[in-house]
Amino acid sequence: MNDRHPPSVSTHRHATRMDDRSLIRQTIRTVPDWPSPGVQFRDITPLLQSPKVFRVLIDQFVHRYFDLRPDAIAGLDARGFIIGSVLAYELNIGFVPIRKKGKLPYTTVEESYELEYGSAAVEIHTDAVKAGDRVLLIDDLIATGGTMMAGKRLLERLGATVIEGAAIVDLPELGGAAKLRAAGLPLFTLVSFEGH
């Protein structure tokens, strides 16, 4: 028996999805030269500070994924936890954290990925998903795609199928979305920004 409940989506708004996406885009703060010179950091925290805008943001993902019926949502450390856990709650499904190496207390599997200068690793608990689970992988932003690709590989190593990768922001100039799509991962993003 499926114990999912209908989403608690706002019904009092009359805005279109494009209006919603414009609101989301306008609310994201751009911080120049952070964390290093030349970088235009896309800060999603203003989206979370307004209950109205946060609801609009979550509703975008609820509308997308309610009928697709994933078995679980896996969120990438750390901002993917914010969106992913709320979305999992709205869809009445489980949430799986994919953490930076050394942050999970139980038995884990690890996947490394390349950074601009060096490498990093993420981990997942070995019992986080079951073979055959259909999982949505979510983060706040797609830049180079390295973290999301590592998350995809972790979930697949545990036997899950990643049905889609999702993010609020795509930075297409960094090539991550193209790389992920070329690796067979469908993507859903709400807004894109030129420059990085």
From Swiss-Prot:
Q: Which GO terms describe its molecular function?
A: adenine binding; adenine phosphoribosyltransferase activity; AMP binding
Write out the GO cellular component annotations: cytoplasm
Annotated coiled-coil segments of the chain: none
Q: In which pathway does it act?
A: Purine metabolism; AMP biosynthesis via salvage pathway; AMP from adenine: step 1/1
E.C. no = 2.4.2.7
Q: Which cysteines are joined by disulfide bonds?
A: none
Keywords for this entry?
Cytoplasm, Glycosyltransferase, Purine salvage, Transferase
> Which superkingdom, per the lineage?
Bacteria
Q: Name one GO biological process term.
A: AMP salvage
What's the catalysed reaction? AMP + diphosphate = 5-phospho-alpha-D-ribose 1-diphosphate + adenine
Localization: Cytoplasm
* SUPFAM superfamilies, per database record: PRTase-like (SSF53271)
Q: Which InterPro entries match?
A: Ade_phspho_trans (IPR005764), PRibTrfase_dom (IPR000836), PRTase-like (IPR029057), UPRTase/APRTase (IPR050054)
Membrane-crossing segments per the record:
none
Concerning its family, UniProt says:
Belongs to the purine/pyrimidine phosphoribosyltransferase family.
Function per UniProt:
Catalyzes a salvage reaction resulting in the formation of AMP, that is energically less costly than de novo synthesis.
Assembly and interaction partners: Homodimer.
Q: What is this protein called?
A: Adenine phosphoribosyltransferase
